[in-house]
Amino acid sequence: MVDLHVHSTCSDGTFTPEELVDYAIQKGLTAFALTDHDTVNGLDRAIRYAEELRQAQAAGSSLPTASVSDADASMPQVPEVIPGIELSTEYQGKDIHMVGLFIDYRQPEFAHYLEDFIRSRENRNEKMCALLREHDIDITYEALLAEFPGAVITRAHFARYLLSHGYIQSMKEAFDRYVGDHCPCFVPREKVTPAQAVELILGAGGVPVLAHPILYHMSDDRLDTLVAELKKIGLVGIEAIYSTYNTAEERQIRGLASKYDLKISGGSDFHGANKPKIDLGTGWGKLYVPDEVLENLRPEKK
Protein backbone atom coordinates (compact mmCIF):
# COMPACT_ATOMS: atom_id res chain seq x y z
CA MET A 1 0.00 0.00 0.00
CA VAL A 2 1.24 3.50 -0.89
CA ASP A 3 0.08 7.08 -0.36
CA LEU A 4 1.01 9.59 -3.06
CA HIS A 5 -0.39 12.77 -1.50
CA VAL A 6 0.97 13.70 1.95
CA HIS A 7 1.78 16.97 3.76
CA SER A 8 4.23 17.82 6.56
CA THR A 9 4.95 20.74 8.87
CA CYS A 10 6.93 22.26 6.01
CA SER A 11 3.58 23.36 4.58
CA ASP A 12 0.26 22.90 6.38
CA GLY A 13 0.57 19.46 7.96
CA THR A 14 1.22 18.76 11.64
CA PHE A 15 3.69 15.85 11.30
CA THR A 16 7.36 16.63 10.70
CA PRO A 17 8.96 14.90 7.70
CA GLU A 18 10.66 12.47 10.09
CA GLU A 19 7.42 11.77 11.95
CA LEU A 20 5.76 10.97 8.63
CA VAL A 21 8.37 8.29 7.95
CA ASP A 22 7.80 6.82 11.41
CA TYR A 23 4.04 6.88 10.96
CA ALA A 24 4.26 5.34 7.50
CA ILE A 25 6.15 2.44 9.08
CA GLN A 26 3.38 2.06 11.66
CA LYS A 27 0.78 2.08 8.89
CA GLY A 28 2.65 -0.51 6.86
CA LEU A 29 3.16 1.68 3.80
CA THR A 30 5.75 0.63 1.25
CA ALA A 31 6.07 4.20 -0.04
CA PHE A 32 4.63 7.68 0.32
CA ALA A 33 5.06 10.91 -1.61
CA LEU A 34 5.78 14.04 0.40
CA THR A 35 3.85 16.68 -1.56
CA ASP A 36 3.95 19.85 0.50
CA HIS A 37 2.32 22.97 -0.89
CA ASP A 38 4.74 24.96 -3.05
CA THR A 39 7.83 23.86 -1.14
CA VAL A 40 10.38 21.05 -1.13
CA ASN A 41 11.90 21.98 2.22
CA GLY A 42 10.93 18.68 3.84
CA LEU A 43 12.23 16.32 1.18
CA ASP A 44 15.87 16.10 2.23
CA ARG A 45 14.82 15.51 5.82
CA ALA A 46 12.37 12.71 5.04
CA ILE A 47 14.61 10.98 2.50
CA ARG A 48 17.69 11.21 4.74
CA TYR A 49 15.83 9.95 7.80
CA ALA A 50 14.38 6.99 5.91
CA GLU A 51 17.85 6.07 4.68
CA GLU A 52 19.25 6.30 8.22
CA LEU A 53 16.55 3.90 9.40
CA ARG A 54 17.38 1.45 6.60
CA GLN A 55 21.05 1.52 7.51
CA ALA A 56 20.26 1.03 11.19
CA GLN A 57 17.97 -1.87 10.35
CA ALA A 58 20.65 -3.45 8.15
CA ALA A 59 23.04 -3.18 11.09
CA GLY A 60 20.62 -5.12 13.26
CA SER A 61 18.73 -2.35 15.02
CA SER A 62 14.98 -2.58 15.39
CA LEU A 63 12.62 0.17 14.34
CA PRO A 64 11.02 1.46 17.55
CA THR A 65 8.11 3.05 15.70
CA ALA A 66 6.86 -0.14 14.10
CA SER A 67 3.40 -1.26 15.17
CA VAL A 68 2.24 -3.19 12.13
CA SER A 69 0.79 -6.69 12.27
CA ASP A 70 2.49 -9.29 14.44
CA ALA A 71 3.56 -11.23 11.36
CA ASP A 72 5.52 -8.25 10.09
CA ALA A 73 6.66 -6.75 13.39
CA SER A 74 10.06 -8.46 13.38
CA MET A 75 11.01 -6.89 10.06
CA PRO A 76 8.97 -3.75 9.33
CA GLN A 77 9.63 -2.03 6.04
CA VAL A 78 11.07 1.46 5.84
CA PRO A 79 8.97 3.20 3.19
CA GLU A 80 10.38 4.73 0.05
CA VAL A 81 9.98 8.51 0.17
CA ILE A 82 8.92 9.83 -3.24
CA PRO A 83 10.10 13.43 -3.79
CA GLY A 84 7.05 15.48 -4.64
CA ILE A 85 5.26 18.81 -4.43
CA GLU A 86 1.74 20.21 -4.74
CA LEU A 87 1.73 23.40 -6.81
CA SER A 88 -1.00 26.03 -6.41
CA THR A 89 -2.44 27.19 -9.73
CA GLU A 90 -5.50 29.00 -11.05
CA TYR A 91 -7.76 28.14 -13.98
CA GLN A 92 -10.72 30.32 -14.94
CA GLY A 93 -11.03 31.66 -11.41
CA LYS A 94 -10.70 28.29 -9.67
CA ASP A 95 -7.86 27.06 -7.48
CA ILE A 96 -6.39 23.97 -9.15
CA HIS A 97 -3.62 21.89 -7.59
CA MET A 98 -0.99 20.01 -9.55
CA VAL A 99 1.02 17.28 -7.84
CA GLY A 100 4.51 16.57 -9.09
CA LEU A 101 5.99 13.13 -8.32
CA PHE A 102 9.62 12.01 -8.68
CA ILE A 103 10.78 15.61 -9.12
CA ASP A 104 14.44 16.60 -9.24
CA TYR A 105 13.91 19.22 -6.56
CA ARG A 106 17.47 20.49 -6.86
CA GLN A 107 17.06 21.33 -10.55
CA PRO A 108 18.10 25.03 -10.87
CA GLU A 109 15.10 26.36 -12.81
CA PHE A 110 12.69 24.57 -10.50
CA ALA A 111 14.46 25.88 -7.41
CA HIS A 112 14.46 29.41 -8.85
CA TYR A 113 10.70 29.25 -9.44
CA LEU A 114 10.08 28.16 -5.86
CA GLU A 115 12.25 30.98 -4.52
CA ASP A 116 10.22 33.52 -6.51
CA PHE A 117 6.97 31.93 -5.37
CA ILE A 118 8.01 31.99 -1.72
CA ARG A 119 8.93 35.68 -1.96
CA SER A 120 5.51 36.39 -3.44
CA ARG A 121 3.82 34.40 -0.67
CA GLU A 122 5.83 36.28 1.96
CA ASN A 123 4.61 39.61 0.57
CA ARG A 124 1.04 38.34 0.67
CA ASN A 125 1.42 37.13 4.24
CA GLU A 126 2.80 40.51 5.35
CA LYS A 127 -0.30 42.16 3.89
CA MET A 128 -2.59 39.70 5.67
CA CYS A 129 -0.85 40.40 8.97
CA ALA A 130 -1.40 44.13 8.46
CA LEU A 131 -5.11 43.57 7.78
CA LEU A 132 -5.45 41.38 10.87
CA ARG A 133 -3.82 44.11 12.97
CA GLU A 134 -6.48 46.49 11.67
CA HIS A 135 -8.98 44.07 13.22
CA ASP A 136 -7.29 44.36 16.65
CA ILE A 137 -5.28 41.16 16.36
CA ASP A 138 -1.70 41.36 17.62
CA ILE A 139 0.21 39.51 14.91
CA THR A 140 3.36 39.97 12.85
CA TYR A 141 4.89 37.84 10.14
CA GLU A 142 7.95 37.38 12.36
CA ALA A 143 5.72 36.01 15.12
CA LEU A 144 4.18 33.52 12.68
CA LEU A 145 7.60 32.33 11.55
CA ALA A 146 8.71 31.95 15.16
CA GLU A 147 5.64 29.89 16.01
CA PHE A 148 5.94 27.67 12.91
CA PRO A 149 9.69 27.42 12.21
CA GLY A 150 10.64 25.99 8.83
CA ALA A 151 7.11 26.12 7.43
CA VAL A 152 5.88 27.85 4.31
CA ILE A 153 3.17 29.97 5.94
CA THR A 154 -0.34 29.26 4.66
CA ARG A 155 -3.78 30.35 5.80
CA ALA A 156 -3.90 27.26 8.00
CA HIS A 157 -0.98 28.68 9.97
CA PHE A 158 -2.80 31.98 10.39
CA ALA A 159 -5.81 30.06 11.70
CA ARG A 160 -3.73 28.00 14.13
CA TYR A 161 -2.03 31.18 15.38
CA LEU A 162 -5.37 32.89 16.00
CA LEU A 163 -6.64 29.77 17.77
CA SER A 164 -3.59 29.35 20.00
CA HIS A 165 -3.68 33.02 21.00
CA GLY A 166 -7.34 32.99 21.93
CA TYR A 167 -8.81 35.14 19.15
CA ILE A 168 -11.10 32.38 17.89
CA GLN A 169 -12.65 29.16 19.14
CA SER A 170 -11.96 26.95 16.10
CA MET A 171 -10.01 26.77 12.87
CA LYS A 172 -13.30 27.10 10.99
CA GLU A 173 -14.02 30.39 12.73
CA ALA A 174 -10.72 31.79 11.48
CA PHE A 175 -11.66 31.03 7.90
CA ASP A 176 -15.25 32.20 8.35
CA ARG A 177 -14.33 35.54 9.96
CA TYR A 178 -10.84 36.48 8.87
CA VAL A 179 -8.79 34.53 6.33
CA GLY A 180 -11.27 32.63 4.16
CA ASP A 181 -11.92 33.64 0.56
CA HIS A 182 -13.70 37.03 0.44
CA CYS A 183 -13.10 37.63 4.17
CA PRO A 184 -11.74 41.03 5.27
CA CYS A 185 -8.18 39.86 5.95
CA PHE A 186 -7.76 37.62 2.91
CA VAL A 187 -5.21 38.55 0.25
CA PRO A 188 -5.07 36.34 -2.87
CA ARG A 189 -1.67 34.96 -3.75
CA GLU A 190 -0.03 35.05 -7.15
CA LYS A 191 -0.58 31.83 -9.06
CA VAL A 192 0.62 30.11 -12.18
CA THR A 193 -1.70 28.28 -14.55
CA PRO A 194 -2.11 24.49 -14.45
CA ALA A 195 -0.37 24.33 -17.83
CA GLN A 196 2.63 26.22 -16.48
CA ALA A 197 2.77 23.87 -13.50
CA VAL A 198 2.75 20.83 -15.79
CA GLU A 199 5.64 22.28 -17.77
CA LEU A 200 7.53 23.13 -14.58
CA ILE A 201 7.16 19.59 -13.21
CA LEU A 202 8.19 18.05 -16.53
CA GLY A 203 11.20 20.37 -16.61
CA ALA A 204 12.24 19.00 -13.23
CA GLY A 205 12.03 15.44 -14.55
CA GLY A 206 8.83 14.79 -12.62
CA VAL A 207 5.46 13.22 -13.26
CA PRO A 208 2.62 15.80 -13.32
CA VAL A 209 -0.67 14.68 -11.78
CA LEU A 210 -3.94 16.61 -11.59
CA ALA A 211 -4.86 16.52 -7.89
CA HIS A 212 -8.36 15.71 -6.56
CA PRO A 213 -10.35 17.00 -9.56
CA ILE A 214 -13.72 16.28 -7.93
CA LEU A 215 -13.00 18.95 -5.30
CA TYR A 216 -13.08 21.72 -7.91
CA HIS A 217 -16.84 21.31 -8.44
CA MET A 218 -16.52 21.88 -12.18
CA SER A 219 -19.11 20.80 -14.69
CA ASP A 220 -18.27 17.59 -16.53
CA ASP A 221 -17.64 19.52 -19.75
CA ARG A 222 -15.41 22.08 -18.07
CA LEU A 223 -13.34 19.42 -16.30
CA ASP A 224 -13.06 17.46 -19.54
CA THR A 225 -11.77 20.58 -21.30
CA LEU A 226 -9.16 21.20 -18.59
CA VAL A 227 -7.92 17.60 -18.72
CA ALA A 228 -7.77 17.68 -22.53
CA GLU A 229 -5.74 20.90 -22.48
CA LEU A 230 -3.30 19.56 -19.89
CA LYS A 231 -2.90 16.23 -21.68
CA LYS A 232 -1.72 18.07 -24.80
CA ILE A 233 0.97 19.80 -22.73
CA GLY A 234 2.17 16.62 -21.05
CA LEU A 235 -0.09 15.72 -18.12
CA VAL A 236 0.76 12.15 -17.10
CA GLY A 237 -1.63 11.27 -14.28
CA ILE A 238 -4.85 12.12 -12.50
CA GLU A 239 -5.84 11.50 -8.88
CA ALA A 240 -8.62 8.94 -9.21
CA ILE A 241 -8.21 7.42 -5.73
CA TYR A 242 -8.78 9.99 -2.99
CA SER A 243 -9.98 10.12 0.60
CA THR A 244 -13.29 11.88 0.00
CA TYR A 245 -14.36 10.23 -3.26
CA ASN A 246 -17.40 8.01 -3.36
CA THR A 247 -17.65 5.11 -5.80
CA ALA A 248 -19.32 7.16 -8.53
CA GLU A 249 -16.73 9.93 -8.29
CA GLU A 250 -13.83 7.51 -8.52
CA ARG A 251 -15.50 5.88 -11.52
CA GLN A 252 -15.88 9.30 -13.17
CA ILE A 253 -12.19 10.16 -12.79
CA ARG A 254 -11.10 6.71 -13.90
CA GLY A 255 -13.22 7.31 -16.99
CA LEU A 256 -11.37 10.55 -17.71
CA ALA A 257 -8.07 8.74 -17.22
CA SER A 258 -9.10 6.10 -19.74
CA LYS A 259 -10.40 8.68 -22.23
CA TYR A 260 -7.16 10.66 -22.22
CA ASP A 261 -4.72 7.80 -21.62
CA LEU A 262 -3.67 9.11 -18.21
CA LYS A 263 -2.17 7.06 -15.41
CA ILE A 264 -4.06 6.65 -12.15
CA SER A 265 -2.67 8.22 -8.99
CA GLY A 266 -4.06 8.20 -5.49
CA GLY A 267 -3.48 9.50 -2.01
CA SER A 268 -5.03 10.50 1.27
CA ASP A 269 -4.09 14.21 1.33
CA PHE A 270 -2.96 13.59 4.91
CA HIS A 271 -2.42 16.75 7.00
CA GLY A 272 -2.35 15.28 10.50
CA ALA A 273 -4.40 17.25 13.04
CA ASN A 274 -5.33 19.88 10.45
CA LYS A 275 -7.54 17.27 8.75
CA PRO A 276 -8.16 14.95 11.71
CA LYS A 277 -10.61 12.61 9.96
CA ILE A 278 -8.12 11.74 7.22
CA ASP A 279 -5.47 9.15 8.13
CA LEU A 280 -2.24 8.37 6.35
CA GLY A 281 -2.69 5.63 3.78
CA THR A 282 -6.34 4.92 4.57
CA GLY A 283 -8.01 8.34 4.36
CA TRP A 284 -11.47 8.14 5.90
CA GLY A 285 -10.89 4.44 6.50
CA LYS A 286 -11.53 2.79 3.14
CA LEU A 287 -8.82 4.34 0.97
CA TYR A 288 -6.43 1.85 -0.61
CA VAL A 289 -3.75 2.71 -3.16
CA PRO A 290 -1.94 -0.45 -4.29
CA ASP A 291 1.78 -0.55 -5.01
CA GLU A 292 0.99 -1.08 -8.70
CA VAL A 293 -0.26 2.51 -8.94
CA LEU A 294 3.16 3.78 -7.90
CA GLU A 295 5.05 1.44 -10.20
CA ASN A 296 2.90 2.50 -13.15
CA LEU A 297 3.74 6.15 -12.45
CA ARG A 298 7.44 5.58 -11.85
CA PRO A 299 9.54 7.08 -14.67
CA GLU A 300 11.66 4.68 -16.67
CA LYS A 301 15.33 4.87 -15.84
CA LYS A 302 17.37 6.49 -18.59
Where are these regions (language model features)?
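Extended substrate/RNA-proximal surfaces in nucleic-acid metabolism proteins
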Residues: 51-228, 284-300
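C-terminal active-site subregion of NodB/CE4 polysaccharide deacetylases
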Residues: 261-267, 272-298
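An N-terminally biased module of ancient metal coordination in phosphate/nucleic-acid-related enzymes
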Residues: 1-94, 179-180, 192-275
